[in-house]
A protein has these predicted regions:
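Short, low-complexity disordered leader/linker segments with a strong preference
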Residues: 1-46
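Short, polar/charged alpha-helical segment
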Residues: 53-78, 170
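Extracytoplasmic "Venus flytrap"/periplasmic binding protein-like
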Residues: 73-143, 177-186, 288-291, 306-308
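Extracytoplasmic/periplasmic substrate-recognition and gating elements
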Residues: 75-77, 178-179, 260, 264, ...
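Glycine-centered hinge/linker elements that transmit conformational signals in sensory
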Residues: 195-196, 243-277
Length: 411
């Protein structure tokens, strides 16, 4: 979510879509290939694309149904929102770029990270929301005044953030305690002590518990999953450098000393890294690793398998040099954008804005974000998750979410 712009990833997505754009033009030269929303009588149909995930589709479909039933109009015409999942292959970014090129892009979609938004903004494909009163109102309602600054692109705002997943360490609590530690390490010295003790007890206590490896990270040996360095490299890199970026615009500005320190931290695992694929390591009766990168979207799965936060696993902050240093971390965070395209009428754009305004206005935003949290177990981008009473019950029920929320300000 922070300053890093995924230049290489976006370039790759663009290259992949280039070969398919030719065969996806408008049928007959005048009409879009897909059935694009538009004004019909006194109804304006607005297309909304969700992430290619069923749980997110279900959430937005329920919001669209409620909005449609409310009978909201613009200039006397009723707005109806139609929801569908965006294309997933070869990537959602490629699907959006193809839709832009072929005039089949929706009026609005979710699932846009800041890096891809920068690419879209540079090509004039999305609206700048900075001067919109409704956008400012939403930021205020969600207490996002500090967070939104990290989403700025050349001083402008093109994305309404929806959710944030801080990527931090997820520790095997039972294994930690067996090694003699009551909490997750915070500093390099504490981290080193834990890994050193693991190595000393690997063939004894750990073997008896079924903990065979220190770190689960199969993507480390897979060149085709290079993007996972955002998680296993950037998280320690940001924490150890005080939040320094490693890409600014199209320029690599990697801090050499910080990069070496991040690799040295990962190197402490030595030959005890589990690089083989395991479908869901944390749902095993006895997880076979000491630590992984967390996966917030799996919280419900853990609960279904009777895993208890604080007993079976615990989140640990990004590792810092010294006690008291800010634990900056990478975050998987995405939001909404409104598309500019000749196939999208002014009425459709206005209708899309009305829908998003209704979902996130002062009266609805807290309930919307609570519904999102309950549906996805992914943290909504808000500045009051641990303070707003409406979230108190779910945070009490899900202490793991409350723990993740503490990492949001540093993402």
């Amino acid at each position: 979510m922070k300053r890093m712009k995924r230049v290489v990833a976006i370039a790759a997505a663009a290259a992949m879509t280039a070969s398919v754009m030719t065969g996806c033009g408008k049928s007959g030269g005048n009409e879009p290939a897909a059935n694009h929303g538009g004004a019909s009588g006194e109804v304006v149909s607005v297309d909304f694309w969700t992430a290619p995930q069923q749980v997110q589709y279900n959430f937005w479909e329920s919001k669209a149904q409620a909005f449609n039933e409310a009978g909201i109009t613009v200039d006397g015409k009723k707005i109806e929102v139609k929801v569908q999942q965006m294309p997933e292959s070869p990537s959602s970014e490629a699907g959006i770029q193809n839709a832009i090129a072929t005039g089949t892009v929706p009026a609005v979609s979710e699932n846009i990270n800041r890096g891809f938004a920068a690419t879209l903004a540079a090509s004039g494909a999305v609206y700048d929301l900075s001067g919109e009163t409704w956008f400012t109102d939403v930021i205020e309602a969600r207490k996002m005044e500090d967070t939104i600054t990290n989403w700025a692109i050349d001083g402008k705002q093109y994305v309404l953030p929806v959710y944030v997943n801080p990527m931090i360490w997820q520790w095997n609590m039972k294994a930690l305690k067996a090694l003699g530690f009551d909490s997750a390490p915070k500093t390099v010295a504490e981290f080193t002590a834990v890994i050193t003790e693991f190595a000393a007890q690997r063939d004894t206590t750990m073997k008896e518990m079924g903990v065979t490896h220190s770190f689960y990270r199969p993507s480390l040996t897979r060149p085709d999953q290079w993007w996972d360095r955002w998680y296993d490299f950037q998280m320690p890199y940001e924490a150890l450098t005080g939040g320094k970026p490693w890409v600014e615009g199209n320029k690599l500005v990697l801090d050499k000393e910080g990069a070496v320190e991040a690799f040295e931290l990962i190197g402490l695992f030595g030959n005890s890294i589990q690089s083989g694929e395991i479908s869901s390591i944390w749902t095993e009766a006895n997880p076979s690793v000491l630590v992984t990168i967390n996966a917030p979207w799996e919280i419900s799965l853990y609960r279904e398998n009777n895993k208890v936060y604080g007993e079976d696993y615990i989140y640990g902050q990004a590792i810092v040099k010294n006690d008291g240093d800010i634990p900056y971390n990478f975050a998987d965070s995405k939001g909404l954008v409104f598309y500019k395209n000749k196939s999208i009428t002014d009425e459709e754009h206005a209708g899309a804005v009305e829908f998003v305004k209704w979902v996130y206005n002062k009266e609805n935003s807290a309930q919307t974000d609570l519904d999102w949290l309950n549906a996805t177990t992914m943290l909504p981008v808000r500045g009051d998750l641990n303070d707003n009473e409406i979230f108190a019950d779910v945070m009490k029920e899900y202490p793991e979410l409350a723990a993740l929320a503490e990492a949001v300000p540093y993402a």
